[in-house]
């Protein structure tokens, strides 16, 4: 991920398809930076599916991005959670699914939110939506310094490669860098062909992304939930017996 620009403080992670591993890459990158003695925050900006928040058991946590941007939550400190993995690593969950995610990401309040995080942290690592699902990733990227585009071996159809190349060539994303996830290191016959196309494109370009999971409930966080334990499970850091 070699780039020529200055400090790459806000890092957005996206992909072509769901299940490419962008949330896994986001979390591991943030942890690596925290271990390097940098103050880091992970922000779940997939406001439609809230994948990272779901992985952490916080999908219905009202104290998240959507609540803060909408004005329901006034204090930024109320949506910042300590990860429990490292003192340098915080997490901001997505909050409840808003009716207008793209509009929320285009708001002045969102710009102020990101500016505040830039002041507070050395690095802001954003878990965004798949770039070919909805416009949210392109909207968010206007505030990013670096874009990590995750491709998963065996998932991406080769017919999608020209679209990814076009994103790179036309500089749709700031300092776009590619991460190949799940690589076995060897050649694979018929790589991805005939699998990703129907999933990525039929899924895609905004139609229905996250709509089937829309919830406006006032769910209360399970008091038994342990954020640190879930993060360790997700990162594979638990002690083996």
Indicate residue ranges for each PLM-predicted region.
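P-loop NTP-binding module
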Residues: 1-241
């Amino acid at each position: 991920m070699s780039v020529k620009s200055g400090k790459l403080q806000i890092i957005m992670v996206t992909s072509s398809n769901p299940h490419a591993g962008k949330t896994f890459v986001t979390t591991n990158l943030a942890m690596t930076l925290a271990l390097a003695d940098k103050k880091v925050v992970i922000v779940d900006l997939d406001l439609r599916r809230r994948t990272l928040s779901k992985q952490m058991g916080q999908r219905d946590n009202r104290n998240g991005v959507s609540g803060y941007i909408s004005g329901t939550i006034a204090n930024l400190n109320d949506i910042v959670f300590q990860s429990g993995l490292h003192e340098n690593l915080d997490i901001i969950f997505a909050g409840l699914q808003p009716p207008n995610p793209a509009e929320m990401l285009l708001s002045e309040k969102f710009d102020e939110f990101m500016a505040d995080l830039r002041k507070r942290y050395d690095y802001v690592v954003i878990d965004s939506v798949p770039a070919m699902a909805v416009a949210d990733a392109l909207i968010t990227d206007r505030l990013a310094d670096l874009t990590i585009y995750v491709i998963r071996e065996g998932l991406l159809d080769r017919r999608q490669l020209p679209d990814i190349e076009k994103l790179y060539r036309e500089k749709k994303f700031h300092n776009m860098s590619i991460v190949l996830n799940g690589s076995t290191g060897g050649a694979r016959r018929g790589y991805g062909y005939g699998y990703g196309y129907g999933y990525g494109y039929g899924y895609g370009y905004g139609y229905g992304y996250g709509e089937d999971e829309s919830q406006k409930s006032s769910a209360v966080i399970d008091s038994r939930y342990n954020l640190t334990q879930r993060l360790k499970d997700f990162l594979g850091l638990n002690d083996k017996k």
